[in-house]
Amino acid sequence: MAFTNYSTLNRAQLTFDYLHTNSTTHAFLFGALAELIDNARDADATRIDIYAEKREDLQGGFMLCFLDNGVGMDPNDVINVIQFGKSAKRTPESTQIGRYGNGLKSGSMRIGKDFILFTKKENTMSCLFLSRTFHEEEGIDEVIVPLPTWNSQTREPVTDNMEKFAIETELIYKYSPFHTEEEVMTQFTKISGTSGTLVVIFNLKLTDNGEPELDVTSNPKDIRMAEISQEGVKPERHSFCAYAAVLYIDPRMRIFIHGHKVQTKKLCCCLYKPRKYTFTSHRFKTRAEQEVKKADQVAQLAEEKAREAESKARTLEIHMGGDITRDSRVMLRQVQNTAITLRREADVKKRIRDAKQQALKEPKELTFVFGVNIEHRDHDGMFIYNCSRLIKMYEKVGPQLEKGMVCGGVVGVIDVPYLVLEPTHNKQDFADAKEYRHLLRAMGEHLAQYWKDIEIAQHGIIKFWDEFGYLSANWNRPPSDELHFKRKRAMQVPTTIQCDLCLKWRTLPFQLSAVEEGYPINWVCSMNPDPEQDQCEAFELKQKIPLGILKKAPKTQEERQKQLTEKIQQEQRKLKALKKIKPIHSQSDLKKLPLEVTSRPFSKYPAHIFQGPQSSFHVVKTNARRRPQSRHAPFRQLQRSSIICTNPKPPFLVDKTEAVLLQPPETPQKSVSLLVKTIPQPPPLVQSLSPSVVPKSNNPWKVETPQIMNTPVAEMPYVPVNPSLVICDHKRSPEVSDEIEDEDRRKRMCKRGRFTVKKEKIQASELSDSSGEENPVDLKTAQKDKGLYVEVRMMGECYKGHVTAVEVGDNVVWWKVKFEDMPKDSTPRDCWVEKGSENVWLVKPSPEYQSTDEQQEDRKGEEDTVVQQALALQQTSTSECFCTEPDTTASTANHKTIDLLVQILWNCLHYFMPLSFPISKKELGAMNSEELLSLPLKECFKQYEVGLQNLCRSYQRCADSQAKVSEESLRISQKKLQETEEKLQKLRTNIQTLLQMAQQGINIRADDELDAYIEDLVSSDD
């Protein structure tokens, strides 16, 4: 049937409303802006400028412009732009980001109602105008796109229909911000080179309060999201500058916002202790199956065309018969050549299909890169790229889902090829959710392995972050800006910066001056202190990342036996269900069934499934009793002897324990420092909770607490405790009733940090005999200790805090110290300590802790406070902890300390003094403390750093020369080895020939057989 006959058939049309519908795919506004940057990157642009031009007459008050220096578009390319869904980039081997032929339209229409595009390529200048305002005012339902073209040299129209050209330019002058031909040509002149593209978006979308969605005024170097609070939001969510910095995994294009360069990042080069892992899987088949299906359709179509051409050639050859005229031979040869060409194409398509089918069976290989973000530890999670373009960011996987400190601060980076996972149209997610979840699961497993490999938890997580300046317990607080912390962070992660000319990435050696001053924005290779990388012609060195291996824990014999038993039981249940099924072979068998079976409606679940046993949570919660408050002396004496309450007892054992504690001791306690003899108790039998109360966690990374079993509890060995501490806090109980009871409390505590500590406060009245037994004068004097800033040694570590309560006993004063910055669940928030013991000492008071009233009272009784602190310092002078601070009132000790520090400083400078420093070591030894303070240490450090770098370079050159010598020696050895092997092989061949000449019946095929035969022959002669 001729194609002209199809003109009478109905056609699908694209309505004007689709422009708005298509734009709603971008829920994330920065994703729409990124679509326009993607187009510039796919056009091989090396620079893109994003800027705003004020136009008060337009909706939003400004126009948003995107100008790049890419290859541009000719008129035919521009025509393809207005065809929704058509893209020349859609090839399996393509590394370009564009796939769907929809990004320019959907992205620009999400930002504003109208856009106009100016592009240059070769000798043509084309303009494309897509306007919803034009369609609304003209009442047009179809999508009409003016598309005029000019000659770039003469600026004359390039068209065969001047009437059409006039209508197109008239619409542009009427509905665009450029109302004359001169203004339109001015936009073309902004494209400075011979090629490039300028996209201008106007009539911007507004928020509910009438302001534009994009804020271009608050920060002249950035484009921000309006009406989004920056507190608690990642910077990439509200700052387009931050989002553009990590938009590509390997940036090769300079991005400017309002004329200011964006400092793009290679995430893999910004991490501490990076490590990569290789992951292979057969699960990623969706994209490969789609490609195989397409290749099969193409191969079948090509095969049909080839068969049809071959059949046509045979028919023509038979029809011609004996006709051997020249025209007949030419016609036959043309048909045969066409058939041969189509057959070759069909064979190529078939081979491509077979190759893709074979690739479908092969596993897909991905590379995960993990590292610690020591600059911003709260910016952690997985950054998932597709064809080098960011799709998902800050995805929490594996242990990070627990919201603890485990794997906190770790960033993962992966670039997923298009053939493994396909992104959605808005490039903010992946199309196949099932395979994406499988990817996240795999990344979680490798993340847990990485956390084990870097051994941060083994050396202490808090200690690790303290070393880099994270001194606050609040996880979201930034690190300290003190110089030594900044230097340490800079030393651990080498600086990787991009050249502004060649766009190559260079890793710089550590420079002390760069920590304070930073690097220039327009950095070039000639500024590199490394002489081997100080030219743009030098090759870009790849980052060397150590390779890690996922070590899966082998299953134990019990786990394998349990899994096998469950599988056998499952198969037995299936077999029983199959035996109960009666096959129906005829209509008579169906009539034999009971009426209720044939007429009963289908129910997916039996009724008994919805009738589970009643939860026993209410019973457990009701029976759980708290420890009553007691003021008896024996209990107070026991607490003085440091009975550490870290193991909470079951509810029904509380009364029994209290009865034992409240009994009078057999012998009175003579000294507080003596340890109390533990009262032996028989191991009780604890009834396990019902399954409805105790939840089962399937999380493989969560450390499961031991469940309360129906077996006797093993008696714990006796551990000596510190006699001067009485810890009031308890470790969080694993019982479900306590967890549910304190759910609201945990939610409130989560705001203070990453961890919460459940408190069970013991009132201060438990630590006193009675109110009548205390001396009022002593109590009044002791109450002045409140607010003192002290330090307590507990469980082998020192913690600082304030005295919040004071109790007076028999010649003993007890302080209740509330600690600060205690992030761990296993550590108490406060404790009672004995004043004057060796485990507590005074430190400098903190003015921030005292209230206004307390500060006024302190000023009134300043002399009494000084006397008390002096007495307390005398009592704590025998402390063995290294944290004890000296008495600041002793001038002699101060002079000795200063002299000692000056001597230490002199020794350090004398040892590290550079040879080229203007001050000699002899002059340095004659300096006093004031002269040492005025010494130019920064210049000294800089010269020392230069000398150290020269020394390292000399070592590097020596090592390189030795490596070259070793490589040359290895090459010579390999050459000799090859020559020896060739001689040996030639000798074997000659021996085999000689043996065959001597013995004609011999048949030796392999070299091993020849060696064995010769060995037997020699041994037999002997």
From Swiss-Prot:
EC number: 3.6.1.-
GO biological process, any: gamete generation
PROSITE patterns with a match to the protein in the record: ZF_CW
One MF annotation (Gene Ontology) recorded for this entry: zinc ion binding
Compartment(s) where it occurs, according to its Swiss-Prot or TrEMBL record: Nucleus
Positions bound to ATP: 39, 87-89, 99-105, 427
Residue sites binding Mg(2+) per the record: 39
InterPro entries named among the record's database cross-references: Chromo_MORC2_6th, HATPase_C_sf, Morc_S5, Znf_CW
Tissues/organs with expression: Protein is abundant in testes but not detected in other adult tissues examined (at protein level). Detected in germ cells with a distinct developmental-specific expression pattern but not in somatic cells such as Sertoli cells.
Main location: nucleus
Top-level enzyme category: hydrolase
Origin superkingdom: Eukaryota
One Pfam family from the record: zf-CW
Keywords: Acetylation, ATP-binding, Coiled coil, Hydrolase, Isopeptide bond, Magnesium, Metal-binding, Nucleotide-binding, Nucleus, Phosphoprotein, Ubl conjugation, Zinc, Zinc-finger
Cross-linked sites for Glycyl lysine isopeptide (Lys-Gly) (interchain with G-Cter in SUMO2): 649, 758, 922
Catalytic activity: ATP + H2O = ADP + phosphate + H(+)
Disruption outcome: Knockouts are viable and appear to be grossly normal. Mutant males and females show meiotic arrest and sterility. Males have significantly smaller testes than control males. Their testes weigh approximately 70% less than control testes. Their spermatocytes and oocytes exhibit failures in chromosomal synapsis, blockades in meiotic recombination, and increased apoptosis. The ovaries of adult female mutant mice are much smaller than those from heterozygous littermates and are devoid of oocytes.
GO cellular component terms, A-Z: nucleus
Subunit structure: Interacts with Morc2a.
Protein name, as recorded: ATPase MORC2B
Taxonomic lineage from the root: Eukaryota, Metazoa, Chordata, Craniata, Vertebrata
Name of the gene: Morc2b
